[in-house]
Curated annotation (Swiss-Prot):
PROSITE patterns membership: PH_DOMAIN, RA, SH2
The protein, known as: Growth factor receptor-bound protein 14
Domains (record comment): The PH domain binds relatively non-specifically and with low affinity to several phosphoinositides, the best binder being PI(3,4,5)P3.
Membrane topology: Peripheral membrane protein
Family: Belongs to the GRB7/10/14 family.
UniProt entry tagged with the keyword Signal: no
A single cellular component GO annotation: plasma membrane
Source superkingdom: Eukaryota
Amino acid sequence: MTTSLQDGQSAAGRAGAQDSPLAVQVCRVAQGKGDAQDPAQVPGLHALSPASDATLRGAIDRRKMKDLDVLEKPPIPNPFPELCCSPLTSVLSAGLFPRANSRKKQVIKVYSEDETSRALEVPSDITARDVCQLLILKNHYVDDNSWTLFEHLSHIGLERTVEDHELPTEVLSHWGVEEDNKLYLRKNYAKYEFFKNPMYFFPEHMVSFAAEMNGDRSPTQILQVFLSSSTYPEIHGFLHAKEQGKKSWKKAYFFLRRSGLYFSTKGTSKEPRHLQLFSEFSTSHVYMSLAGKKKHGAPTPYGFCLKPNKAGGPRDLKMLCAEEEQSRTCWVTAIRLLKDGMQLYQNYMHPYQGRSACNSQSMSPMRSVSENSLVAMDFSGEKSRVIDNPTEALSVAVEEGLAWRKKGCLRLGNHGSPSAPSQSSAVNMALHRSQPWFHHRISRDEAQRLIIRQGPVDGVFLVRDSQSNPRTFVLSMSHGQKIKHYQIIPVEDDGELFHTLDDGHTKFTDLIQLVEFYQLNRGVLPCKLKHYCARMAV
């Protein structure tokens, strides 16, 4: 180390020796060379005074001692010598000392049914499921695994479910700059319903299974066939297709296979020479048409569309139209399973796995939604007891609800409120409007659209004002993928006003009692009321 420093200084001295012999002599004195001349004998220094000569010698001695002191200090030992010589140094350093979080963030805006919105700054690799969970926690909603993000393309009237494993930031990257597109958050009860009741979504006249599945087919067997990577059932039926670049529609017989969607050029023949490829699915998504008749001139309101992922114009759309809602649901569900079947099944079975934005603790729901974790309790006696009989538990729950409302009415009556029918109806109206399933003044068509958007599975319902009969109500519900409407008739008994669905055989003092009764009992309805349609703010 000392030698290299001296060599460097000697080299520097030699480089400047041609121009300045004085610099060479001073450098030798500073380095303590034995052959250095006396400063008095060096040309150019003979004019220095003795005082100046002594000062120069002292400065040179101090410089010499300082250099020697620096050179003699031992180097600081390296506490991790193996990291300096290891070929894996960079890998270990990156693992042991990670850099600051470099995940890119992006702002996305999510809308609700009432058009309120919330802007979120999220990592670019966050999934749609994580975005739903963040909004659920922020708004203190109960997570029942039905909350869903929807991609809404306003300018062409299309909408689709953003699957739980998809990245919303990628969805936004496919939008055009000037397009008025939105992400909506709402419930979709039909999102994974086909895993529970596959035959409900795939009617026998539209599905052809392999020969080995002839005979009785259990839901488990049907599900295994749809999730199989080697075979896939053939979906077939008539559809209306919009001709490319034209406004006209043409009816043809279509076949859905693993290789794509085909139509027959000769009736219902499925011979290879008669089949022509209509679209494949590797670079496209399936959308529901919201206003097919108005925007695209569709012959029926049950339209859907195959749209490429890239931003494009209406010419890139593959517009289709079914004869009924059940047929459209079958086609759309089959295409979803064909594209992401096993991934959708994993999303359904393990909704809280694979989070990218937060850990499992911060993303856990604030309230448990598992019915198995709740027990019915009876506190009427001196000691509380668990009610084991389910029938008794339901009856106790109904009785407590009725008693609560009765006490509330008595409190209102004691304060001089409702003896008059008009005052009583005003109180009931205030109670009804506080319920999430009550939608007040919406039309029949709007009620149908709302139920379809939130998944037309059996038992999805809402209550609204009747447009044809003032001061009465209508129960709108879905069953068999059809929307049905039931008039809630007001009846009077002993001067009191009641509500009924069965001509007075079962009477209720308000709509809350009516809804709770039919949530527990089928009665005159085709099925029990299971899921209510609500417009939640984000």
